[in-house]
């Protein structure tokens, strides 16, 4: 029976995991099993935080719009409702940017609803 040297594929898979674990501390960057666990944990955390970032920015935009709209004597929910009724299709990110950078422009949006 001929000798079988263990696989190119397995070595590549392990090296790929260890490359992803570069920068981790101790055994988490040097040994395959702890590195694999840490890489999986890091991927879960990065996915979770990408989703959380979307929620956080939406919260920030709503807070900024609410503060700017209350200066004009209106509530946030009434402002958004009137935007939809008047068919002005500006998303919250754009409205928040206008509110922060161009108060006169934001005032004109509020008055034109």
Swiss-Prot record:
List, alphabetically, the GO terms of the cellular component aspect. chloroplast; ribonucleoprotein complex; ribosome
| Signal peptide feature range | none
Does rRNA-binding show up as a keyword for this record? yes
Q: Which UniProt keywords apply?
A: Chloroplast, Plastid, Ribonucleoprotein, Ribosomal protein, RNA-binding, rRNA-binding
Q: Superkingdom of the source?
A: Eukaryota
Alphabetical list of CDD domains matching this protein: Ribosomal_L20
Named from the GO MF annotations, one term is: rRNA binding
Q: Name one GO biological process term.
A: translation
Where does the record say this protein resides? Plastid, Chloroplast
Record InterPro entries: Ribosomal_bL20, RIBOSOMAL_L20_CS, Ribosomal_protein_bL20_C
Stored SUPFAM superfamilies: Ribosomal protein L20
Q: Which residues form a coiled coil?
A: none
- HAMAP family per the record? Ribosomal_bL20
What family classification does the UniProt entry report for this protein?
A: Belongs to the bacterial ribosomal protein bL20 family.
What job does the chain carry out? Binds directly to 23S ribosomal RNA and is necessary for the in vitro assembly process of the 50S ribosomal subunit. It is not involved in the protein synthesizing functions of that subunit.
Q: Which PANTHER family match?
A: 39S RIBOSOMAL PROTEIN L20 (PTHR10986)
Q: What is this protein called?
A: Large ribosomal subunit protein bL20c
């Amino acid at each position: 029976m001929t000798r079988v040297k263990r696989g190119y594929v397995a070595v590549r898979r392990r090296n790929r995991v260890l490359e992803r674990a570069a920068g981790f501390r101790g055994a988490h960057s040097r040994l395959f099993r702890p590195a694999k666990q840490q890489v999986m944990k890091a991927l879960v955390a990065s996915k979770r935080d990408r989703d959380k970032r979307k929620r956080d920015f939406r919260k920030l935009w709503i807070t900024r719009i609410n503060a700017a709209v209350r200066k004009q004597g209106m509530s946030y929910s009434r402002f958004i409702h009137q935007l939809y009724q008047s068919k002005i299709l500006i998303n919250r990110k754009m409205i928040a940017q206008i509110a922060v950078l161009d108060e006169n422009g934001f005032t004109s949006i509020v008055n034109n609803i």
